[in-house]
Every structure is written in structure tokens, then in C-alpha cells.
């Protein structure tokens, strides 16, 4: 499991569909992929019997809808922040600041708004898919199977997760979740709040006007601190995104 700092769980956001164990993605190879509104709570046992490309496709069908759903939640949050900025609602901005681990007392209205807009934003779909694939072994790791842990997030309280067979810190556990969706939420909140990923967020802010398919590979280079292997981890993410054509999902939508 890759080494990574833990983050506090985001407050539960509402996702409007029922939980199911299967999902289908469009066969289109364009960036207008439509993904049915179906979510898996956990990785089904049959997934572990699959091999090769069949297992990879199964994993994508399980995880892609979850990534899109949480990105949609983040877009709604961003709109709420932008609305608070427009109306000069400092009380609401302060509440968002606390959730996104910013001390509001340190900033005036303009400074706080900019810092929030650097944090409350989506994660490129191809990048999230690649990290889930690498961190969970395409959904085959025992942490994914037993703890719904797709992204190898560390926690420091034993009751919060599962102990790895080898870890550089004896107190470290891989954080477990009640569902796969919770795992995706926590992963995105971690990238959006932890100090280790400030360079990632700053680069995302600069790339905001660019096309979505151009962002994943350009932002991956800022995730060297996600794993102990550093730049080798970045190279692995880039290889997974490229060899599996994950950019085809850059503009994917739930529908």
C-alpha cells in the first residue's frame, strides 16, 4: 500500500441514486461517455475471479460512477462557495473554510474566497481512476475487499482501519470505509485539503481554463508525495492512464 497522510472524512453529501452492485459504461470511445446512475457499495466477490482486461473493465464500471458522483457533489459545493462570494456572505464562507481546513480568521474576504476556490474543486477523472487502480490493485487488495479502501489512505488509530503486513510506522493502518463512495469522498477531500497537495491544487487552479483531457497527466506530476516511492509513483500513474486510455472518460457524465 502506498504511504499517504490521512484526512478527516467529509460530511456526507447526498447522492440521489440507490446503491446497486453493477454499473455499465458507454462503449463510446469519445469524451462524451455517458455512465448510468448506478453505484456499488462494495466490490462484489465475482470481481476477484476475473482476470486481465475483463477485471480491469469490471473495476472501471464499479469505480467510474462513484468518481463522477463525488465530482458532481464538489461542483455543487463550488457553486455554493461562489454564491457566498457573490453575496459577501462571510458567515457561510467561514463555514466552508472550517470544512476545508482553512482558519478563516487569518484572511480577509478576498483572500478567503481565493483559498476556498483553490480547494473546493473536482479531481480529473482519469487521475482518480488511475490512483484507484494503482492503490487497490484494480480492486483486488484485501483493503479494497474487506475495507472498501480504494486509495490506500492511512489512519493512525487502529480501530479506523486495517493493519498492513509491512508499514514504516507501526501505528499506521489503512483506513476502512462503510462504502466505496465514502472512500472516494475521503480521497478527494484529502487532495483538496492536505498540505502535501498544495502544489497539486495550485496547478489545478492555473489549469482551470484548459480542456479536461489535458489536466490529468499535467497534474499527476504533483502527486509524488502521495506514495513513498515518489517520482516512480507518478510514472506509474501516467503509465496506467496512458495504457488504459483513461482520458476517454475526461468529460464523462452520469445519466
Model regions: which residues?
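Catalytic cores of secreted/periplasmic lytic hydrolases that degrade extracellular macromolecules
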Residues: 1-9, 14, 19, 24-130, ...
Amino acid at each position: 500500500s502506498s504511504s499517504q497522510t490521512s484526512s478527516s472524512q467529509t460530511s456526507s453529501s447526498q447522492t440521489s441514486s440507490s446503491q446497486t452492485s453493477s454499473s455499465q459504461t458507454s462503449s463510446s470511445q469519445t469524451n462524451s461517455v455517458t455512465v448510468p446512475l448506478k453505484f456499488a457499495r462494495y466490490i462484489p466477490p465475482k470481481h476477484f475471479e476475473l482476470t486481465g482486461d475483463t477485471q480491469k473493465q469490471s473495476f472501471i464500471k464499479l469505480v467510474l460512477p462513484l468518481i463522477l458522483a463525488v465530482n458532481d457533489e464538489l461542483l455543487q459545493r463550488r457553486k455554493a462557495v461562489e454564491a457566498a462570494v457573490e453575496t459577501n456572505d462571510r458567515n457561510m464562507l467561514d463555514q466552508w473554510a472550517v470544512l476545508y481546513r482553512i482558519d478563516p480568521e487569518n484572511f480577509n474576504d478576498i483572500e478567503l474566497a481565493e483559498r476556498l476556490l483553490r480547494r473546493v474543486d473536482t479531481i480529473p477523472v482519469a487521475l482518480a481512476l488511475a490512483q484507484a487502480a494503482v492503490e487497490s490493485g484494480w480492486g483486488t487488495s484485501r483493503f479494497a475487499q474487506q475495507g472498501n479502501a480504494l486509495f490506500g489512505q492511512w489512519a493512525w488509530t487502529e480501530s479506523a482501519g486495517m493493519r498492513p503486513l509491512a508499514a514504516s510506522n507501526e501505528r499506521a493502518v489503512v483506513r476502512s470505509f462503510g462504502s466505496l463512495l465514502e472512500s472516494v469522498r475521503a480521497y478527494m477531500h484529502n487532495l483538496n485539503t492536505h498540505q502535501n497537495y498544495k502544489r497539486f491544487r495550485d496547478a489545478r487552479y492555473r489549469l482551470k481554463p484548459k480542456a479536461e483531457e489535458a489536466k490529468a497527466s499535467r497534474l499527476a506530476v504533483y502527486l509524488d508525495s502521495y506514495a513513498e516511492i515518489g517520482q516512480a509513483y507518478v510514472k506509474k500513474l501516467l503509465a496506467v492512464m496512458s495504457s488504459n486510455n483513461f482520458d476517454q472518460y475526461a468529460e464523462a457524465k452520469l445519466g
